[in-house]
């Protein structure tokens, strides 16, 4: 088995392409179910955010797995593989494990150290478990990753200087307008990104805030928390007339604000500039609006310059977290290496129990007067003897499994105990294809 990551992210793909490969939240479960039925794929978790779409998979063959995951992405988004391939980054084995740890800890984020990705990874993992797309390996790996990410943020100060993308948008607005107290701010979208932006705006002094959303009740709930006003999207054109700053993150599939709409609005704004930040993927605002004289549009990729400000301090903390990651990878790989010895141990236990069972049958034939209580006591004690005898050999087998040249040593181990290798290999296949669905996961 092999661990594989196929990624399209902000480092290698512009927003124009990333928005073509973005899974909507409502379709993630179906996507993971579909991928699970692809050739070579044994387990999978799909993570899709504004900055990345990544497929994490356990595959039986690397080459075949790579191909069918690429094909799945191309088919799902109705693209040709040739269109998708140039923007994909592939991580394999140790690189894939390290990448998952780094992403979940926020070290691979546009804003190093942000914590939003941890929640997104956890949500995707839980959804994958719900559709039984994860098995023995990912159930262990993702739990370990989530636990470490929580510890990394609690034991370092990386989160204190880190910014989310929505906070970066607010910082950009402050650089342009200075104080935000007198600015009229318009928020499009009442989801997580919109609320994060509003939290940061409120913390930066903004008090004239309007929240708009397709579902007005959601906008009202969010606006009430921060003493803002809520309006339906049907009044968008009027709201654009009043706004100084617009931050948009609706998750709509088409442009919410078109160039045609903004051209009409500009004529009525009497030359007042409008600062617009589009942090949605796919984008909410037609990029052609940036051509208009009074509109200043920034998308999610433009925020890179803002997030660089605190990078030096965050990188110091990131080094500490990377060390923690490397230690944790050793722990996971040790666990992973012992998976191969599980069938051997199982075969050893079964053989010992078979001997114990045969001995009990022989004893009962020779001493037919044994009472039920006496049989239970003898059976219990003979099993105890077996467990004591097997304890050290099993520990040694696990240690051998983590060493180089483990296959030859374990074969000798099997020979010493006269274990049938065909039986061991049969058990190994069962373990390899096992789908151990265990929904327990560390809470955030």
From Swiss-Prot:
Q: Which domain of life is it from?
A: Bacteria
Give the enzyme class: oxidoreductase
Catalyzed reaction equations: (S)-4-amino-5-oxopentanoate + tRNA(Glu) + NADP(+) = L-glutamyl-tRNA(Glu) + NADPH + H(+)
Q: Name one GO biological process term.
A: protoporphyrinogen IX biosynthetic process
Q: Which UniProt keywords apply?
A: NADP, Oxidoreductase, Porphyrin biosynthesis
* Important for activity, annotated site positions: 99
Q: Which InterPro entries match?
A: 4pyrrol_synth_GluRdtase (IPR000343), 4pyrrol_synth_GluRdtase_dimer (IPR015896), 4pyrrol_synth_GluRdtase_N (IPR015895), GluRdtase_CS (IPR018214), GluRdtase_dimer_dom_sf (IPR036453), GluRdtase_N_sf (IPR036343), NAD(P)-bd_dom_sf (IPR036291), Shikm_DH/Glu-tRNA_Rdtase (IPR006151)
Gene Ontology MF, one: NADP binding
Q: Where is the active site?
A: 50
Binding residues annotated for substrate, in chain numbering: 49-52, 109, 114-116, 120
Pathway assignment reads:
Porphyrin-containing compound metabolism; protoporphyrin-IX biosynthesis; 5-aminolevulinate from L-glutamyl-tRNA(Glu): step 1/2
Q: What is its EC number?
A: 1.2.1.70
Residues annotated as binding NADP(+)? 189-194
Similarity field: Belongs to the glutamyl-tRNA reductase family.
**What's the subunit arrangement here?**
Homodimer.
What does UniProt say about this protein's domains? Possesses an unusual extended V-shaped dimeric structure with each monomer consisting of three distinct domains arranged along a curved 'spinal' alpha-helix. The N-terminal catalytic domain specifically recognizes the glutamate moiety of the substrate. The second domain is the NADPH-binding domain, and the third C-terminal domain is responsible for dimerization.
Instruction: Add the further remark from the entry.
Output: During catalysis, the active site Cys acts as a nucleophile attacking the alpha-carbonyl group of tRNA-bound glutamate with the formation of a thioester intermediate between enzyme and glutamate, and the concomitant release of tRNA(Glu). The thioester intermediate is finally reduced by direct hydride transfer from NADPH, to form the product GSA.
Reported function? Catalyzes the NADPH-dependent reduction of glutamyl-tRNA(Glu) to glutamate 1-semialdehyde (GSA).
Q: What is this protein called?
A: Glutamyl-tRNA reductase
